[in-house]
Amino acid sequence: MTQKSSDTGIRLAQTADADTIWNILKGEIEVMRQAGRDQWQKGYPNPEVVAADIAAHRGMVMVCDDTIVGYCALITTGDPCYDNIWDGQWLTTSNSSNCRYSVVHRIGIDASLTGQGLAQQFLKLLLEESRQRGCESMRIDTNEDNVQMLHILPKMGFTRCGIVRVEDGPRHAFEQLL
């Protein structure tokens, strides 16, 4: 399940990767805090969430030249938070009980590598992975103050479909057909 784009690829995260993954996410948390954003400022994500992702085989790492530079959870079993959408509708009719979509959560890139287009590369690789797993679309959500993701997602062909509600509030919901 590994794809490569020159010397960059993705693979399932392993237990041995947990500290590196957590350092990447801590860097993202700090970037968001310094930018005055609310997202990821209330103890989520945390090392326990990363461990659960790895144990459930949904943690994915992006690797460049044998170095982990990105992380996300790629979920293909549905997300109940996506069963209800406000101010719009999904492009597909799939829901968490008959899931035919993938979901990207907790995506982060090593903060020292910001501005190199790695988030877009990572998403492209995840889109291809989702295709290979038989998904008909990919869904992702982000906070209203995550300016980078709100810019990147439409640029990459994602359609804003509406608002979903997660534990800590509403999120802009996007979907791309595969």
Role assignments for model-derived ranges:
Residues 9-23:
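A short beta-loop-alpha structural element at the N-terminal edge
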Residues 29-49:
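Conserved GNAT-fold acetyl-CoA-binding loop/helix
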Residues 58-72:
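Conserved beta-hairpin
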Residues 73-106:
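Conserved acyl-donor/pantetheine-binding loop and adjacent beta-alpha core of acyl/acetyltransferases
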Residues 109, 115-128, 151-155:
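Conserved acetyl-CoA-binding loop-helix of GNAT-fold acetyltransferases
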Residues 114, 140-150:
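Conserved beta-strand-loop-alpha-helix junction that forms the acyl-donor binding cleft
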Residues 130-142:
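Conserved GNAT acetyl-CoA-binding A-motif
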Residues 141, 154-173:
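Conserved catalytic-core motifs of GNAT/GCN5-like acyltransferases
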